[in-house]
Every structure is written in structure tokens, then in C-alpha cells.
């Protein structure tokens, strides 16, 4: 096993091969990575079977689905890499140019960060997404996967590096930390001088640990306590469709709805319909029904477990939905501000003034009017695959694509000027 220190030194030694690579060279490397990923399908599936067997009974079925790979999912990962090829190269982009009275010409240019560290949990697709995005944005990457997905991740990284071996980019620009202990995560948090940026992707425990302990600059990809508010002027059919998609299409992801707020004027009509759709109809279809966590007012209209205080501060990542009835738009916004992780929140309303108030007052990375929160995604936003959803305001916010993985520098051109 290569030590963490050796890996940090290896990636530092070769980072220039990617930091200054041309768009053509990077695109050739990405295509080679995608091809080798598909070619290694058999090896990756064998590794994934080991991870799945070890995880069964230890994590929920929803989380097992995040870990699971088949040939179609591997092909989708490769397709995601190829889609990055089609994205414009951000490196070298001129952001601003100005000329001073003394004749100096100042140009602000986009440049690579350098080396980016990614700490993430049991999501194999993050491995290929992170490698593709960092490479296209001119960065080397150090990956630290969760223990549950390590065998799968190792097989994926092996395939990606074999792809790089056929190009002029050194394969060591992608590093996988082999030690999955907590100490390896803390070592990355303290790797100042080796990592230029650290991005955690996972649950609240991981993200909080990184934010609280890292001395390396961090972009916080926050948890998703995502709200949908059904206003008194909502179209109920539209609301039900949005709720169904936001909660059930993929409950294990961070843009899935966790909290439903319903105006009291709508509760008596929409909540029984919601119960029919999310419980009765799903049972009839052989699907897992939604489990409700209900406040006292919501429990008057549907059956379910009484909500506890912490339910409105929980990212369930499962077929569980907390429901609260509110008396006004203002109460809904106040609730969101008290419980939000500033990820994605939505209002369903036909009232333009209510929509404007909601979008002005709710301080989240993505705020929706009459649309599912499941659109908070790099691909859906036209950014290609993403590095995560940033819930902070400094440097990057919302889905992080290529540009969010870059910095800039000033190039100052003169003709012998000196400062008086």
C-alpha cells in the first residue's frame, strides 16, 4: 500500500501535466477513460458484487441501490465522461480585460485550482464524475471513497488510469487513497500544501467533520433538507405531480423532497389525495409506500406517525416524508429559514406575488416555482455532470460544474512602466 504522503507527493509531481494541458489533450484523455471504463465492466461488476455482499443488511435498501452497479449504469458513467468532452474548456478563458491610464493592460484569466481532494461515501458514479470534471478543468484529483464502496471504486479508478496510460497525461493525476480509515480523511483535511481544495460529498456527519476540522479550503456540499410548499393558490394536480416526483423518483439523493408544507386552506382537499397517491396506489403497484411524519394539523386528514421535532431537521434519504400544515405563506417561509440546509426549496402556486415573495425570501442555492426540486443537478442545469451541490455562498453555490472548479489570475502586460 502506498502511503498517503507518497500519494500527495506523486500527485504534486505530475499535476503540471494536467494543469497546463490543451483542450485537445484533455478530451483525448477523457475519451480513453470512458472507453477503458466500459472495457472493464466485468471487473467492475465483480468488485461491486463484493461490496454489495458486504453491505447487505448493514445499510438500507435505498442506500444499497446507490451502491449497486450493472452494465447499464457503467455505460451511463462512461456516457457522462463523454458528455464532459463536449463542454467548453474553461481554462484560459478571459474574464475581464482593462487598460490603465499608465498603459498597463490587465487581463483576468481562468486557471486550474491545482489538486482537488474529494471525500465521499458509497456512490461509485462520483468516482468517474469527479475524475472527468477535475481533468477537464485542468486539475489533478485525490479520491477518498467510503469503505462500503472501496472495491468498486478501486476497480473504476484502475480502469480510468489505464485509459490515461494511453495518453500524454500522467495517470498519477488521479489518486485513490487506499486507506479507508477515519485517519485518512483527517489526513486529507490537514494536507495544506498538497491539496488546493477539499470537497466532501456525503451525509451531514461527513460534511460537518470536514468543515470543522479542515485547514485546506473547503467547498461545503450540504445535505438536502428540501421543502415543497403548497400555497393556498396552488393547482392541486400540479402540486401532486411535483410532490410525487420530488419524493419518489429517487429518494436517496440530496435534491429529493424531505419536508412538505401545506397551506391550511388546501390541507383538507390535497392531503387525502396525497395519501391515496403515495400510500394506497404505491402499495397496489407493488412499490414501497411513503411513511408520513405528521404534525398535529396534518394528522387530521391522513394517517401516519406523529412527527417529532427532529423530523423537520432530518435528511431521510428514504421513503419517509414529514408533513406540516401552515397558516400562511409567511409561516412557510419562516419554517424553511429555521430548518433549511439552503439546498433546494419549492413553492407551488398560481399567485405571482406569492411566488415572488417566496423566491426573494428563501435563501437557498436553488429556489423553484411550480417545478420539482429534482432538477437541482449539473446535467439538468446544462453544466454536464457535477462535483456536488454547494450550499455555501463563497466561491461556488448550487451545482458545481467545470467553472466552479477553477480560480483565476491577473496577467499584467506593460512596456517598462514603474510605480512612482
From Swiss-Prot:
This is Gamma-glutamyl phosphate reductase. Pathway: Amino-acid biosynthesis; L-proline biosynthesis; L-glutamate 5-semialdehyde from L-glutamate: step 2/2. It is an enzyme of class 1 (oxidoreductase). One of its GO terms (molecular function) is glutamate-5-semialdehyde dehydrogenase activity. The keyword Oxidoreductase applies. Belongs to the gamma-glutamyl phosphate reductase family. The keyword NADP applies. GO terms for biological process: L-proline biosynthetic process. InterPro entries: Ald_DH/histidinol_DH (IPR016161), Ald_DH_C (IPR016163), Ald_DH_N (IPR016162), Aldehyde_DH_dom (IPR015590), G-glutamylP_reductase_CS (IPR020593), Glu-5-SA_DH (IPR012134), GPR_dom (IPR000965). GO terms for cellular component: cytoplasm. It comes from Streptococcus pneumoniae (strain 70585). Catalyzes the NADPH-dependent reduction of L-glutamate 5-phosphate into L-glutamate 5-semialdehyde and phosphate. The product spontaneously undergoes cyclization to form 1-pyrroline-5-carboxylate.
